[in-house]
């Protein structure tokens, strides 16, 4: 008789002991009886016979691979998350007959000498940062690294931050790796996911391109992980467990013989500081030499005569333009011109956004919506106007001002399904549309030959925000959007901002900005300090505050040396009818932070809170 400690999946019950007539390996998936139900569980370890009576488990053909088990345990510990919830993120493996595919000989473009040198340098390190300018040929280096990995009979994973990147990236990779390639993201149907996993089990799929959840797939003999656009905040989960997929990849490179390459034209300050003295590979210049002219317009207006002239020139030459707008929908706020009050969500302490497509105001936090009011609820005035412009308003204005222009929008409202996303991108690629207006989705990795003009509107709303990363996020975004223009033909970048004197200093070389920001960034914030954010919420504001005060008192006796604590009302005070209070822990030593949080959670299990280790922002 054998006894095993089992973590029930999709259940917050702590690990339980079950018996079996045969021995099971760590990571095996088993069926277990629990509260009159049969659940899946994961074997954590074999244990001695307990003093109490145990129920019997039943084996299944599925199991988690060693790297998956190691990663799950690390996530639970580092992010202070429930192990059963973490294990539920992972897709298990199943042994089956291997598909006898004909060996694919990838037909790759020949690398330039600079690219060849960069690839050789990357291969010297288990983890490295490929800091390559937009258009410098990072993707070609990725493909050569992947081909070499597959040649060694190992599998490879290419992570991209958003689904919007995957169709175009997939097309380029499909031509080279054919049936060895599989695409994974959250919008696949259950049937599509099942078919995908069957091909993964048979090792028909050896290369996976996917968003952050692809890291939890059972890739047998995983030898290479590439994190494209590593700076992107989309790699950070905002639901428990609040992991960062990029950081998890670096952990795997430390624990297993898995090479990790982080790639970006605008690497995060954290990654730049981590790699700049040991494993940073710099790739300067463009693979295709083109000219790019940067035009600044110091204005708070959006659709100006100067911008219209630039767009008309693009249309006259039968070329294309992309326009970045920081807000989807029509306006960030609907503002009364008499009392200057905006329309706020009744359940959250944030302004609602105007969506003309559905004729509604919507809260982007709790998704509450309401009809557009005709009068101000505060003063009864009928003069309500938008404070900030959005994608739909830009579309409507340009359609009325640019005769014959074919304009489309790329934002979350217009890409609710994979089919809609494909249609928008395919139409733009086929030049069925001349102008593509988008939010941050438009900055991410798109490569279109006829784009000769990239327009940046409203960047001031980002660089003037309250975030400690505001300038980094804004300048990075400028570079990324500018990189969509003049990839194969000469072009222009048109930037509207009242901060032109500041931004002009950083548009020659992004590394200049990184070095500037390393000097200017306060030592209280990353990459110099590590942060952990604890959130306490309640429908009653006073009780939410009491929870945070009680937690502060308990934490004070749990803090490791060098950990500081600050307690405050959340900048967004209320979300989904719950009031929010935050405790921010800081330390230069991440282990001290983790120990402090673990001690607090153990000392005060009755105080409900969410733990966000390494938050990308404080809101």
Curated annotation (Swiss-Prot):
Keywords on record: ATP-binding, DNA replication, DNA-binding, Helicase, Hydrolase, Isomerase, Metal-binding, Nucleotide-binding, Primosome, Virulence, Zinc
Reaction it catalyzes: Couples ATP hydrolysis with the unwinding of duplex DNA by translocating in the 3'-5' direction; ATP + H2O = ADP + phosphate + H(+)
Broad class of enzyme this protein falls into: isomerase
Chain positions of motif DEAH box: 228-231
Cofactor: Zn(2+)
Entry annotated with the keyword Metal-binding: yes
Domain Helicase ATP-binding: 119-285
Domain of life (superkingdom): Bacteria
Cofactor: binding details: Binds 2 zinc ions per subunit.
One cellular-component annotation, GO: primosome complex
InterPro entries: DEAD/DEAH_box_helicase_dom, Helicase_ATP-bd, Helicase_C-like, P-loop_NTPase, PriA, PriA_3primeBD, PriA_3primeBD_sf, PriA_C
GO biological process: DNA recombination; DNA replication; DNA replication initiation; DNA replication, synthesis of primer; double-strand break repair
EC number(s) on file: 5.6.2.4
Gene Ontology molecular-function annotations: 3'-5' DNA helicase activity; ATP binding; ATP hydrolysis activity; DNA binding; zinc ion binding
Residue stretches making up the Helicase C-terminal domain: 371-532
Function (record text): Initiates the restart of stalled replication forks, which reloads the replicative helicase on sites other than the origin of replication. Recognizes and binds to abandoned replication forks and remodels them to uncover a helicase loading site. Promotes assembly of the primosome at these replication forks.
Subunit relationships: Component of the replication restart primosome.
Assigned protein family: Belongs to the helicase family. PriA subfamily.
Name of the featured protein: Replication restart protein PriA
Organism the protein comes from: Helicobacter pylori (strain ATCC 700392 / 26695) (Campylobacter pylori)
Encoding gene per record: priA
